[in-house]
Amino acid sequence: MEEFQRSLQLARSHEHDFLYPLIFQEYIYALAHNHVLNRSISSLLETKGSDNKSSLLIVKRLIPRMYQQNYLIIPENDSNQNPFGGRNNNLYSQMISEGFAVIVEIPFSLRLLAFLEGNEQERLKWKNLRSIHSTFPFLEDSFSHFNYVLDILIPHPVHLEILVQILRYWVKDTSSLHLLRFYLYQSHNWNSLITPKKSSSFFSKRNKRFFFFLYNSHVRESESIFVFLCNQSSHLRSLSSEDLLERIYFYGKIERLIEVFANAFPVMTLRLFKDPFMHYVRYQGKSILGSKGTSLLMNKWKYYLVHLWQCHFYLWSPPGRIYRTQLPNHSLDFMGYFSSVRLNPSTIRSQMLENAFLIANAIRNFETVVPILHLIASLAKAKFCNVFGYPISKPVWADLSDSDIIDRFGRICRNLSHYYSGSSQKKSLYQIKYILRLSCARTLARKHKMSVRVFLKRFDSELLEEFLTAEEQVLSLTFSRASSAFLGLDRGRVWYLDIFCINDRASHE
């Protein structure tokens, strides 16, 4: 009961008017001394140099200038002029968006810290769930039971008013919502806030924190409706009569949605969507929906999602956004792996009294394979090999010292070995390692102006020993190379719970 009351109190804290006083009053700087929020906002509370300007002090000075009407009169043929002050629109846009994003993140940080405080087990669990590999152990247990998987590309962009309405459910600050709406509409790239195309990616690149906040708000709303319809329960706990009234139009949309499905599928009701073995995973702007159901059920889910996006978010979804994969006939491209279900036949001899029977069974195993062709193409693009996978030297790194060259190649190899340690088949991973090893040797030989064979004979393995040993330390963990435990580890899958990002291969060029 106490835990429920504490959760209820934290949920109600979202209704406080927190954004307006934080922006317009001076005691915001006292938050810098709060150890709870020090890490998340201290960087924005400081006034930075001209190369990296992002400060709430500057944001507070910019807000009055935004509301001065004479700054908003801009000639149509002058797209580079700044509507916020006549200087650099990109700089001011970035400062205001970053300041707004860090403030609205405060309630979520408080809820998370309150949940993890004093609970070491939950803190460790939360840390492990942040890893990119944390999804694979879950799929390892469930994927083999799936018959169909829907590979879903989350739709975008969302209209600006939809985003403002989503935030209105938990931000009870009219001034803040007006400021947000004003800022969004005045941004010259407002029509592509969450569009990942290169031609319109200015906002997402220069305003990453704000971009992720808006995107996560949109995804959170979409998933909450999805869970609501799956469970046929109340959507988003209503704590006030205003919330209930705001949801009337939403329930009207749901009734209309059910009518559409009733006309399209006369025998289908919302109950048929309840699948006791339905699993949902979201990752990198995509999501997968796995089920043990039939093809008809997955088609119903597909059309349901399309109508949900159209009726609630007013988004048109092209057919290619949802792709259905049948297991085990096809594999799924999931987070850099080709994931599939393989049927391993086995024969069991059973004997009853004088009669013996042979029973043939097919065991479904979860398989993860390294996409060797994609990795070779990526290495070829980075000039480590040609398009056929033949290792070549890296001339750009030839001017570096031997230790730097070995360290760079070793870091790339360790990162790939670390991430693809969960592969069921190690042969492809060994091929990638071979390409990097020989490319390193060719680069060193090019630097010393000798052939690879002469270089290896002269220096033997002294220079490359550090490269190979450092690489194998990741795979061997604490086991020795000759131990049986390491031999089993080398053949099996290993998932790491400390991978929070994928290092860029070319970041050190």
Curated annotation (Swiss-Prot):
Entry keyword set: Chloroplast, mRNA processing, Plastid, RNA-binding, tRNA processing
One Pfam family from the record: MatK_N
GO terms of biological process kind: mRNA processing; RNA splicing; tRNA processing
GO cellular component terms attached to this protein's record: chloroplast
Listed InterPro entries: Domain_X, Maturase_MatK, Maturase_MatK_N
Superkingdom to which the source organism belongs: Eukaryota
Subcellular location per the Swiss-Prot or TrEMBL entry: Plastid, Chloroplast
GO molecular function: RNA binding
Family: Belongs to the intron maturase 2 family. MatK subfamily.
Function of the molecule: Usually encoded in the trnK tRNA gene intron. Probably assists in splicing its own and other chloroplast group II introns.
PANTHER family: MATURASE K
Protein name per the record: Maturase K
Gene that encodes the chain: matK
